[in-house]
C-alpha cells in the first residue's frame, strides 16, 4: 500500500505531461474552435508546426525521466529501517521553550540511521534558525504532526542567517509530511518591512521552509502559515513533488510568496491551497519542467513566472505547465514579468483550464516590470518571451482589460496561442484584450493566433 501511494503522484505527473502534449499535437485549439466556423487550424500550418515542435521537445520525454530514484526497484537506494524516533527523545519539550538543540540532535541521529523522525502532535515546538544538512545514510522520512513555531523576537536572529528559518540542504530521498503546521509568526517582520512603511530601510527577512540542492523530494500534507517572508522555497532541487499543502498569510503581508521555485528541475506542485500577500507560486531563473495542477490561489498576486532579468541579469525558464485551478480576488492571474535590461529566455509555457474569480489582471505579460522606489530607466535588452499558450481560461475580471501583453520593443514576444478565453467583467460586462510588440509569426513566418471571447483578434501591434 505504501509503495502504491508513493507511486501515484509519479503516475499523475507523467499523465499530466503526456496528456497535455498529446492534446496539443492533435489540435491546440480543439476546445475553442467550437462555434467558430470561420477558423480552420489547417490554414495556418507554418504557425502551428514550429510551436508544436517546441512543445514536443519539452513535453515529449520518456516517463523514466520523471521517476524518482527511490521508487526504482532495481539498484535503488537502501530503504529506511522501520524505526521511529521522536524529537522528544532528544530533549524537546514542545511547551514554547527553545527546542532548537533537541531538533539538531534528533536530525543527526535520523540522518545517520535512516529512522523515521517524528514531531509529535498537540505540541508547539519553538525553533530558532536551523539547518538540516545531508547527505544522509538512506531514504529519510520526517513526520511533522504537531506545530513548529518561529520566534517572533527579531533579536533571536542576531548572528544567524536572516534569509532562512528552517533549511534542508544536500539531501536525497527525503519525504516531509505529517499533517502538522509551520508557523512563522511573521507579524513583527511585516510591520518592519519597507514595503509596508516606506520610511524604513529594506532588510532581509527569513523564508520559512527552504529546500536547497535536494533530490528526489516529497513535501506533502502540511500547513505553512504566516511566514516572515516567502513560505516555501525550492532552490536548485531536482525531482520534487509538493502536494496537499495549505499555505496562508494575510492579504497585506509583504513578500510572502506561497511557493517559490528557482533553479529547480522536474517539480510538480499539486492539489494545494495558497493564499498570501504575494505570488501564490513564483517560478524564477534556472527552472525547467515545472508543473502546477489543481491549485487554489487567493488572496495574492497570482501565479507568476518571474520576475526575470533584474539588475541586468541573465535568466532562463522553460517547460512550464499550469493545468487546472481557481484564482480568487488576486491582483494578477497568470503573469510573466521581466525587467528591462535583462537577457535570456522564458519559453515553452502553457496555461490551461483555469477559472478566474474577480481577478484584476487575469492574463498579463509585463516586460516593463519595476518593483522599485525609483522609476526604472529605459533599457534596450530584455528577456525573450516565446512559445506561450493560454487555453480554456474563463471567469470574471475586475478590470476592463482582461488580457494584456505588454512585450518588449527591443525583444518582442514570439509564438503565441490564445484560445477559448472567456473572461467577463462583474455583472457580465464585456472585457477587452490589449497587446503590443508581438512578432506576427513564430520563428519564421505565419500568423500569431488569438481567439478571445470566441472572436479572432487582429489588433495586436508590432
Swiss-Prot record:
Q: Which residues are connected by disulfide bridges in this protein?
A: 280-297, 407-413, 435-460
Q: Which Pfam families match?
A: Glyco_hydro_28
- Protein origin, superkingdom: Eukaryota
Sites of glycosylation? 173, 294, 358
State the PROSITE patterns in the record: POLYGALACTURONASE (PS00502)
> Keywords on this record?
Cell wall, Cell wall biogenesis/degradation, Disulfide bond, Fruit ripening, Glycoprotein, Glycosidase, Hydrolase, Repeat, Secreted, Signal
Q: Which reaction is this enzyme known to catalyze?
A: (1,4-alpha-D-galacturonosyl)n+m + H2O = (1,4-alpha-D-galacturonosyl)n + (1,4-alpha-D-galacturonosyl)m
Subcellular location, principal: secreted
Active site, UniProt feature: 278, 301
Q: Which InterPro entries match?
A: Glyco_hydro_28, Pectin_lyas_fold, Pectin_lyase_fold/virulence
Q: Where in the cell is it found?
A: Secreted; Secreted, Cell wall
What span is annotated as the signal peptide, if there is one? 1-22
A molecular function (GO) term? polygalacturonase activity
Q: Does the keyword Metal-binding apply?
A: no
Q: What is stated as this protein's family in its record?
A: Belongs to the glycosyl hydrolase 28 family.
Q: What does this protein do?
A: Acts in concert with the pectinesterase, in the ripening process. Is involved in cell wall metabolism, specifically in polyuronide degradation.
The identity of this protein, by name, is: Polygalacturonase
Amino acid at each position: 500500500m505504501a509503495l502504491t501511494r508513493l507511486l501515484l503522484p509519479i503516475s499523475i505527473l507523467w499523465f499530466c505531461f503526456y496528456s497535455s502534449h498529446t492534446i496539443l499535437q492533435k489540435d491546440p485549439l480543439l476546445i475553442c474552435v467550437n462555434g467558430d466556423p470561420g477558423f480552420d487550424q489547417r490554414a495556418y500550418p507554418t504557425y502551428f508546426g514550429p510551436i508544436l515542435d517546441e512543445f514536443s521537445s519539452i513535453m515529449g520525454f520518456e516517463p523514466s525521466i520523471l521517476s524518482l530514484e527511490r521508487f526504482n526497484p532495481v539498484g535503488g537506494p537502501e530503504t529506511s529501517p522501520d524505526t521511529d524516533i521522536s524529537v522528544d527523545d532528544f530533549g524537546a519539550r514542545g511547551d514554547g521553550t527553545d527546542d532548537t538543540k533537541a531538533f539538531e540532535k534528533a536530525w543527526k541521529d535520523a540522518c545517520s540511521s535512516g529512522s523515521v523522525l517524528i514531531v509529535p502532535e498537540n505540541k508547539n515546538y519553538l525553533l530558532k534558525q536551523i539547518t538540516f544538512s545531508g547527505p544522509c545514510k538512506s531514504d529519510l522520512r520526517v513526520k511533522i504532526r504537531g506545530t513548529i513555531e518561529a520566534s517572533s523576537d527579531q533579536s533571536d536572529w542576531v548572528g544567524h542567517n536572516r534569509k532562512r528559518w528552517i533549511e534542508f540542504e544536500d539531501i536525497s530521498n527525503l519525504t516531509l509530511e505529517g499533517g502538522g503546521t509551520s508557523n512563522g509568526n511573521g507579524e513583527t517582520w511585516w510591520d518592519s518591512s519597507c514595503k509596508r512603511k516606506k520610511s524604513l530601510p529594506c532588510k532581509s527577512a527569513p523564508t520559512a521552509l527552504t529546500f536547497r540542492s535536494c533530490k528526489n523530494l516529497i513535501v506533502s500534507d502540511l500547513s505553512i502559515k504566516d511566514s516572515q517572508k516567502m513560505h516555501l522555497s525550492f532552490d536548485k532541487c531536482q525531482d520534487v513533488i509538493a502536494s496537499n499543502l495549505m499555505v496562508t498569510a494575510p492579504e497585506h503581508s509583504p513578500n510572502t510568496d506561497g511557493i517559490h521555485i528557482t533553479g529547480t528541475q522536474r517539480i510538480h506542485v499539486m492539489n494545494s491551497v495558497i493564499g498570501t500577500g504575494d505570488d501564490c507560486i513564483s517560478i524564477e531563473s534556472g527552472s525547467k519542467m515545472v508543473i502546477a495542477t489543481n491549485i487554489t490561489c487567493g488572496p495574492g498576486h497570482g501565479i507568476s513566472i518571474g520576475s526575470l532579468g533584474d539588475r541586468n541579469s541573465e535568466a532562463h525558464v522553460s517547460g512550464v505547465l499550469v493545468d487546472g485551478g481557481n484564482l480568487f480576488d488576486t491582483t494578477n492571474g497568470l503573469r510573466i514579468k521581466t525587467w528591462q535590461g535583462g537577457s535570456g529566455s522564458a519559453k515553452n509555457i502553457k496555461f490551461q483550464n483555469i477559472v478566474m474569480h474577480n481577478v484584476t489582471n487575469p492574463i498579463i505579460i509585463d516586460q516593463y516590470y519595476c518593483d522599485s522606489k525609483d522609476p526604472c530607466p529605459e533599457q534596450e535588452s530584455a528577456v525573450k518571451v516565446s512559445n506561450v499558450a493560454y487555453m480554456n481560461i474563463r471567469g470574471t475580471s475586475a478590470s476592463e482589460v482582461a488580457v494584456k501583453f505588454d512585450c518588449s520593443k527591443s525583444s518582442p514576444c514570439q509564438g503565441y496561442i490564445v484560445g477559448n478565453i472567456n473572461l467577463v467583467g462583474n455583472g457580465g460586462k464585456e472585457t477587452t484584450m490589449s497587446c503590443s510588440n508581438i512578432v506576427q509569426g513564430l520563428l519564421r513566418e505565419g500568423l500569431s493566433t488569438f481567439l478571445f471571447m470566441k472572436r479572432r483578434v487582429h489588433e495586436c501591434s508590432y
